[in-house]
Amino acid sequence: MSLNILGKVAGILALTVGLAGCMDVTMEIDVQTETTGKATTTSVMGADVYAMIKAGAGSDDAGDDGFCKEAGATLTENADGSATCLLVVEGPFAELNDADAKDDGAKFEVVSPGVVKVSFTTEDMKGELGTEGQDEETKAMMQQFFEGHSITIRIKGKEILDTNMTKNGNSAEIVIPFLDLINGTVELPPALYATVKVN
């Protein structure tokens, strides 16, 4: 699990296109103390696409298809034919970011006793996902795959004190349509953040 959320969106899109389908992705950071948290990534692949992936793999073992292959991930096949991949990592903030995240991972800063600011840059998200250089057929295919699907980024704590995302009870989140990323029309501040109370 990585909190290198925005930097990894390009990878998510590349994987999704490679699977000839689309999914909805929710990435959540639950700040539990001044030094620890829980990161949860939930990816849902629609029934039609998941059926194609399984058929393409030549077996009922979805693990062969590349979807939900990350260490520690749990795959659930839903009654409607869709599939949900859940990955949870809990522990010190340093363990929530990939070792290779470098400057693109989530930043955790204790701003006062019991108050933590979580932030991450949006530059990678805005810079890597345009369709420049692609032919019209490829652009049309990507539009079809990703229409109606989105990535949700959520930060939780005991209380949200300040944020530039949408506040919803004890969480702050932003929902970004994949098409806005692909078309380069997404409007984001230089960084997304939420300041949360943890006690």
Where are these regions (language model features)?
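Bacterial N-terminal signal peptides that target proteins for export
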Residues: M1-A10
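Residue-level signal for mature regions of secreted extracellular proteins and peptides
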Residues: L15, D60-A62, N78
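C-terminal motif of bacterial Sec signal peptides marking the signal peptidase cleavage site
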Residues: G18-G21
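Bacterial signal peptide processing site
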Residues: M23-V25
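Buried hydrophobic packing residues in well-ordered domains
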Residues: M27-I29, T35, I153
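Post-signal peptide N-terminal segment of mature Sec-exported envelope proteins
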Residues: V31-A47
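Post-signal-peptide N-terminal segment of Sec-exported extracytoplasmic proteins
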Residues: V44-T74
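Mature, soluble, non-transmembrane domains
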Residues: E70, T74-N199
